[in-house]
Amino acid sequence: MADNSKFIDIKESIRSKNPALLKLIPKFIINYLRKTIHEDYMNDILDRHKKINGLDFVDSMVHKEFKINAIVKGFENIDPSKRYIFVANHPWGGMEAATLLDIVGKKFPEPRFIVNDILMSIKSYHPLFIPVNKHGSQGRENARLMDENFESDKPILIFPAGLVSRKTKGKVVDLEWKKNFISKAVQYKREVVPVFIDGRNSNFFYRFANFRKAIGIKANLEMFFLVDELIKNANSDLPYYFGKPISYQTFDKSKRPQEWANAVKEHVYNLKEDYTRKFM
């Protein structure tokens, strides 16, 4: 595949975000990053599937390329006539999101996932993604698109942590969940469906993340290993536990939005034990 048709280009991604930084990075570092994120391998996959998009693309990635076997519990109780925000933990870094889209898309034909705008470089996902710029101010167009989708009947999917789970005190858990999904649920009168995804990355990923943090590096360097983790997690069983929908009216003034977000996160991590349990 010619360079001008690349779907993923680490050098161009850095250039578009921070041209000054790119000038400071030696060529051998760029080449190392390309190898680390399996740039050629991923571009080959995307090139072979460039004529399909949306849920068809997701189906191909989940079932043909990476062969993820979702073991789903509780989804049969989700009413397709209602408006939902699906919130889940974020254990892997990519393919668990595609698999969640695949599951939800079987019952809801137009699911939408709120994602980092960097992922918009994969055009086959465009019909399914609502971009958010986590590295700068969100543009007016993205804000308009966000409101338009929340006002619609389309199900909205969110990883409230925004980042992949880390290992803390021996347990793989999300970082703090952002409160935005609580505010949106109340504003747009949507029920919240809690989802627990029972997955994890390699010990290397967690050790690297903890080492990076221990030596005082703030940059999320472990993100460069997520494609490597994606490949390691291929051909896996991945359990999904869908809890009972939570009414937006639950999120009253008795708690602050962040406290409600923390409570929903705790509830999600208890779903593996009993996904039929009620929230609070």
Predicted regions and their residues:
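Conserved beta-strand termini and adjacent loop/short-helix elements that scaffold enzyme active sites
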Residues: 73-75, 114-116, 132-133, 243-245, ...
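Residue-level signal for well-ordered alpha-helical scaffold segments within enzymatic catalytic domains
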Residues: 60, 99-106, 183, 187
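Short, well-ordered coil/turn elements that cap or connect secondary structure elements
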Residues: 65-67, 108, 124, 187
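Non-catalytic C-terminal accessory region of glycerolipid acyltransferases
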Residues: 2, 10, 143-280
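Membrane-anchoring hydrophobic helices of lipid-metabolizing enzymes
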Residues: 1-84, 97-99, 126, 280
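Short, flexible loop segments at the rims of nucleotide/cofactor-binding pockets, characterized by
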Residues: 61-67, 132-138, 170-171
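Short gly/ser/thr-rich secondary-structure transition/capping motifs
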Residues: 65-72, 138-140, 223-224
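Catalytic core of membrane glycerolipid acyltransferases/transacylases, capturing the structured
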Residues: 39-41, 84-138
